[in-house]
Amino acid sequence: MPTRFRRWPALIAFAGLLIASSASAAEPDVKASAASEGIVLPKPADVQSLAVYPTKITLKGGDDAAQLILTATLADGRLQDLSGDVKYTVIDGKTVRVTPSGRVIPATNGSTEIVASYGDKSIRIPVAASQVDENLPINFANQIVPIFTKLGCNSGGCHGKASGQNGFKISLLGFEPETDYVALVKEARGRRIQTSSPEHSLLLEKAAGVVAHGGGRKMEKDSDEYKLVRRWVGAGAPYGKETDPTVTKVSIYPEHRVMSRNNRQQFSVYAHYTDGSVEDITRRAQYDSNDQEIATVDAQGVVRTLGLSGEAAIMARYQGNVITFRATVPLGQKTPAWQFPNQTVVDKFTSQKWKDLGLVPSDLSADATFVRRLFLDLTGTLPTPKQVSDFVSDKDAQKRDKLIDKLLDSPEYAFFFANKWADILRVKRGKEGNNVSRAQGTFAFHNWIRDAIANDKPYDEFVRDILGATGDETKNPPTVWYKDLAQPEQFVDDTAQVFLGLRIACANCHHHPYEKWSQDDYWGMAAFFARIGKKAVTVPSSNATQQGPTTLQVIFSKPSGNVNNKRNGQAAKMRALDGPPMDVASDEDPRMKLVDWMVDVKNPFFAKAVANRYWAHFFGRGIVDPLDDMRVTNPPSNPELLDALAKNLIDSKFSLKSLVKTIVKSRTYQLSAIPNDFNKHDKQAYARYYPKRLGAEVLLDALCQVTDSPTQFGGLPGDKYAPKRAIQLPDESYSSYFLDVFGRPQRISACECERVSEANLAQALHLLNSDEVQNKLARAGGRADALVNVKDARPDTEKVEELFLWAFARKPTSDDLKAALEHIGKYEKTKKVAYENILWALLNTKEFIFNQ
């Protein structure tokens, strides 16, 4: 029977003890009562005053409506939404009606007042309605298309997908209303619209469920949406006039509100038009929450907080415009007094957020915990037992800062972060596999990245050297970036995602559904790469190991070139995001103009993107999460903190080491991962350290360190600093089942999400029962073998302590030590097997696999 199978029965009790000890469609216009939702309303006596928004209402036409926002100021200063809880009274009883949720609907022409009252407090709202009985013109793009968007008709899963649905296709999310109008009104000989009998139009019959519809019933016949579409069809289904106003932006009220848990808040959304008019579109906009564990939102614009504290952003989208409402939800419990020293600028803004949310930070991490955390986060390497012992016993109050400075100057830091950047810069040999010429370029680019990190090359220069690279890999290794990317679209996608923290690939084909970026924005960026030229140059072999001449790719800037905007087929003008069109002379490289815009200190994306990326590396979650999806509708959990980190980077002349020091020298980074009663549910405020699984390369190297059994990687270039280390590998072409099963990325995208961090069964089985791990445990000259060598006369207690220091950077607890010694006592004649078993148990604990 193989050793690894014999090992199992004897290990169950010991491993069990050790593992256990390790750290570880439109809705009806009715609002439910507060009591039915578990909401505790304020006592009338606690309400100090009432405020209303808007302060007056003007309605035009029978289709118009307005949402009232009633806010109470309570005795303790808190604000409470009462929009659906006050009593509404219309003074003349006829001009308008007010729903229980506070929606004002015109009934007849005239002027009156609405009185909103709660207990003995009341407020009056003037209201005027006109042209209620007139059939005002309807604009297809402004009024009909938003209905299709709200009901999901033009979503990617329905008629908005590229192939359409059941023979009917309209533009995704209504971004091309002219095309939609033709498809709806004129295609198929106009069979979808029946102007002479609107209610018999196929459009309305399917939407109302009169005729079978794969998407089910979308409208009720008495709904506002049905009535408006019916009136539009009856009016001849017009598109509208060229002089009709168009939407320029949307706004929301309120923009932010501090809410208690299990509460609700109504907001209102407004469209601003080119003619200066403003329209309430609360019931026509589309909503989504970025964190439904904290807050949800319904179709009427009512936000409901749940049982968790934190912050949630509610996206409101209307005709390609987006805006967000932010809900801050404190824990709402009485907390003990606490003080938090500001070791770096980080602590100022994290501690303020904890106060806002009613959180209490965890204690400072123990020295042993910190040293392991720091070594893994900065170097991808475990500290040795001596390094742990020396650090823990050191009485210098500045020892943590000094260790940080020391590790930042280590070769392992450069290798580890070179590996991180190589992932998203797609440093690989690609389809050519072990082709020598491609391998040389890959190694050269990897070495260039490593040297740049080791020498703390200013980040703006780092990016400029990559994006503006010319020549060949022998003289300018960053030109290798242009080997894997061939089309302007690829350059735009990777540039935006890696260096600006933006995912704008959607705008290649259509307006971005969750951002303001249009196809014009996308192709304006692509135009900067239109003049890239490539040519192949054959050179003689440079060393005896090469067989024949080598072909090099030379990158240069052409005097002319363009890309066509997919939207209109015309040549796109060079234009940076949110910037005006640029003219670039024929003797200039457009890429340099793009980089000039990117690295400008006023650029709203560049510094924040890398600051957020580095923060995510150390904390496991970005201030903006996902870390490369920075957009209005995915706001930072702590915008002031992100601004401060970006400013720090700029002020340091784009020193990445300075950025790292600002983060890891903070007390926030050095907090314990052990939660308290106040932060145990925190997932976004960093009131405690969030444990992280070790990445594939780091885990393999750690396993090799603990077992003292290095992994051999065939063909690895010689290196004087860290030979035979996974974090040293220049690309993904080195065969390793271990690295693949633990989530090593193949570098086929610029997204860090390609690296898999989730656990799976294959990983567990590989650690438990693979030949690879077994061979490392049993290797002659390995850790277990050395511990039983006659030259090592130390008692078993010291040897067990050493193993724990290697694996966990701590000594064993009394229970750990007792279990280990009892296990060794059962193997007097085969003590090496006993130590192999203990190592095996250590490697299979969460404490080993996680950085905490």
Where are these regions (language model features)?
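N-terminal secretory signal peptides that target proteins for export/translocation
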Residues: M1-R7
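Bacterial N-terminal signal peptides
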Residues: P9-S21
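Extracytoplasmic soluble-region selector
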Residues: A25-K150, H159-G160, G164-N166, I170-S171, ...
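Structured, non-catalytic alpha/beta "coupling" segments that mediate domain-domain communication
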Residues: E113, S117, A235-P238, L306-R326, ...
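Sequence context surrounding c-type heme c attachment/ligation sites in exported
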Residues: P126-Y181, R192-I193, S197-H200, G209-R230, ...
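Primarily short, surface-exposed interaction patches in extracytoplasmic proteins
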Residues: W338-E412, D423-G718, S749, C753-R755, ...
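Long, His/Glu/Asp-enriched segments that create or flank divalent metal/ion-associated functional microenvironments
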Residues: T707-P717, R725-Q728, F738-G743, S749-H766
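Globin-like tetrapyrrole-binding proteins
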Residues: I838
